[in-house]
From Swiss-Prot:
It is an enzyme of class 2 (transferase). Belongs to the SUA5 family. TsaC subfamily. It is found in: Cytoplasm. GO terms for cellular component: cytoplasm. Gene3D superfamilies: DHBP synthase. Its main location: cytoplasm. The gene is tsaC. Required for the formation of a threonylcarbamoyl group on adenosine at position 37 (t(6)A37) in tRNAs that read codons beginning with adenine. Catalyzes the conversion of L-threonine, HCO(3)(-)/CO(2) and ATP to give threonylcarbamoyl-AMP (TC-AMP) as the acyladenylate intermediate, with the release of diphosphate. GO terms for biological process: regulation of translational fidelity; tRNA threonylcarbamoyladenosine modification. It comes from Vibrio cholerae serotype O1 (strain ATCC 39315 / El Tor Inaba N16961). InterPro entries: DHBP_synth_RibB-like_a/b_dom, Sua5-like_dom, TC-AMP_synthase, TC-AMP_synthase_SUA5. PROSITE patterns: YRDC. This is Threonylcarbamoyl-AMP synthase. NCBIfam families: L-threonylcarbamoyladenylate synthase (TIGR00057).
Length: 188
């Protein structure tokens, strides 16, 4: 495992199917290429997370998320509300497109997506050219890591790269809302 300032090293690791850790608004996230099944299964094994739960996709812009979302199942008002809320630490559960891999959406016909305002996430997703998975960096039953040092202690031997940086200081993970009902699914 390497602690890197150079985002290109993280992008190279993602392209090779590796799992990385990176800072987000509130906690460090674990990420991989959402379209690489081997990488996703590796991430889920590290987290000890069942594939049925699905994972969040995090991106620099909605354009990066659009291929994973079925906009035809949303009203114009619903889509406008979602887009107006970003970038922010707000995750929306939206109808999944037919191209969204089952290992991303889990047992659901929806996909959880977020456009982050964190500068490291923005740069990383732009350099990678697509979204990353975003699940809290921690082992099952352990608290989410909020510093690079915590990531290295808890997960260092299981991930390829820790991207240097700090969280934005937000306490806890992002809020999650349903795009169709607007119901809050997880308080943020």
């Amino acid at each position: 495992m390497a602690l890197v300032e150079n985002l290109q090293q993280a992008v190279d690791a993602l392209r090779k199917g590796c799992v990385i850790a990176y800072p987000t608004e509130g906690v460090f996230g674990l990420g991989c290429d959402p379209d690489n099944q081997t990488a996703m299964l590796r991430l889920l094994a590290i987290k000890q997370r069942p594939v049925e739960k699905g994972v969040i996709l995090i991106a620099a812009s909605y354009a990066q998320l659009r291929p994973y979302v079925d906009e035809t199942q949303l009203t114009a008002e619903q889509l406008t509300q979602v887009l107006a809320s970003w970038p922010a630490p707000l995750t929306w559960v939206m109808p999944a497109s037919g191209d969204t891999p089952s290992w991303v959406r889990g047992q659901f016909d929806t996909v959880a997506v977020r456009v982050s305002d964190h500068p490291v996430v923005q740069k990383l997703c732009l350099a990678f050219g697509k979204p990353l998975t975003s699940t809290s960096a921690n082992l099952s039953g352990q608290p989410a890591c909020v510093t690079q040092q915590e990531v290295m202690v808890q997960l260092g031997n299981q991930i390829a790269v820790v991207v240097e940086g700090k969280t934005s200081g937000r306490h806890g993970p992002s809020e999650i809302r349903d795009a169709r009902s607007l119901q809050v699914l997880r308080q943020g």
